[in-house]
Each structure stands twice: as C-alpha cells, then as structure tokens.
Amino acid sequence: MKALTARQQEVFDLIRDHISQTGMPPTRAEIAQRLGFRSPNAAEEHLKALARKGVIEIVSGASRGIRLLLDEEEGLPLVGRVAAGEPLLAQQHIEGHYQVDPSLFKPNADFLLRVSGMSMKDIGIMDGDLLAVHKTQDVRNGQVVVARIDDEVTVKRLKKQGNKVELLPENSEFKPIVVDLREQSFTIEGLAVGVIRNGEWL
C-alpha cells in the first residue's frame, strides 16, 4: 500500500467512521460538506486517488458506491500469549490485526506470533519479534516450526526420527527439547516464513 497524504487519510477516516456509525458509506456531497470541499467533484478526485492507492474500491453507478479494502479488522492476526489447552488462534489470544500483506512471505503467512525469549537469536529471531507463520502441519526436518508440546507453544528447528522429535534452538545457551511422541502430546501449528523486527512500526 502506498502512503496516504494527510488529506487522503482524512477522507479515508471519514468513510470508515461513516460506515461504522450508519452502516453505509457517505455520498460525495457528504464528504465535500464534512471536509469543506467546494464541490462533490473535489471529493471524487480524492476518492480516485484512494482507489489508485488500493485502499478503497469505487463501485460505479451508485452514489454511495465506496468499498473499503483496508479494513482494520482484516489483516494478519497477532497471537500473543497462549493459554494452556486452547487453540492457538482462539479469539482471546489475538492481540490485534495488522495490515501486513500475507503474500510478502512464501508460502503466504496466516498469522503473526509474538516471539518470547532468545532461543532462536542466531538466525535473527529475537525476543519481541513478530514471527510470520504459515498454518500447516506439512513440514520437513530442518525447517523452523511453531510447535505445541502438551500445552506449551515454542519456535524451534524440527528434527523428527521415529517416535522421537528434537526441537533444536539456534542459541548455544539453550538445550534441545526432546519429545517422546508415545508419552507427550505434540502438534505442529505452522511453519515460520518470516520475521518482523520487534513490531516497532506497527
């Protein structure tokens, strides 16, 4: 998404707020009146600019034909601390949604996970970083995965052999986690596909 000018942001915020309050987008005349434009045509020019930048879609032939493409409730969910025994993407674990394009990652990211600890620092995954995760159980040895052991969620490099799984850290100060699949509950929650440093820009 290209950055919006201050005026374009005003128009976008007005559309979003109007939809939130009334259930429908404003007309060009209402935008012009609210923001002090001389005519609805001026509002139309700003709408076209917003459409070019990919944040709205203009539906032709309708006075209220504006559709938001950048909805704050959409985007990648950010998962924080996970309570024992509950699904990773349970609503209570989601701290918010962030406008990160899933296709920036290969394969596409499905959610972000806030990293806790420094066990993977040697490959650049730091405490507090946001890890982009592709939700899948189809993973191979050597890949960095998000795994759940009993009720604990961890990020490690996978090494599986028979009934034994080793979850390898990327920090010599940490020891591998060894899982006996005959005795412990073990689930792959997803594959790490990228990292966003500390989330400071979010």
Curated annotation (Swiss-Prot):
The keyword Kinase does not apply. GO terms for biological process: DNA repair; DNA replication; negative regulation of DNA-templated transcription; proteolysis; SOS response. The active site is at S119, K156. The record marks A84, G85 as: Cleavage. Residues 28-48 bind DNA. Keywords: Autocatalytic cleavage, DNA damage, DNA repair, DNA replication, DNA-binding, Hydrolase, Repressor, SOS response, Transcription, Transcription regulation. Disulfide bonds: none annotated. Gene3D superfamilies: Umud Fragment, subunit A, Winged helix-like DNA-binding domain superfamily/Winged helix DNA-binding domain. It catalyses: Hydrolysis of Ala-|-Gly bond in repressor LexA. GO terms for molecular function: DNA binding; serine-type endopeptidase activity. SUPFAM superfamilies: LexA/Signal peptidase, Winged helix' DNA-binding domain. Its EC number is 3.4.21.88. InterPro entries: LexA, LexA-like, LexA/Signal_pep-like_sf, LexA_DNA-bd_dom, LexA_repressor, Peptidase_S24_LexA, Peptidase_S24_S26A/B/C, WH-like_DNA-bd_sf. It is an enzyme of class 3 (hydrolase). Homodimer. Represses a number of genes involved in the response to DNA damage (SOS response), including recA and lexA. Binds to the 16 bp palindromic sequence 5'-CTGTATATATATACAG-3'. In the presence of single-stranded DNA, RecA interacts with LexA causing an autocatalytic cleavage which disrupts the DNA-binding part of LexA, leading to derepression of the SOS regulon and eventually DNA repair. Belongs to the peptidase S24 family. HAMAP family: LexA (MF_00015). This is LexA repressor. It comes from Citrobacter koseri (strain ATCC BAA-895 / CDC 4225-83 / SGSC4696). The gene is lexA.
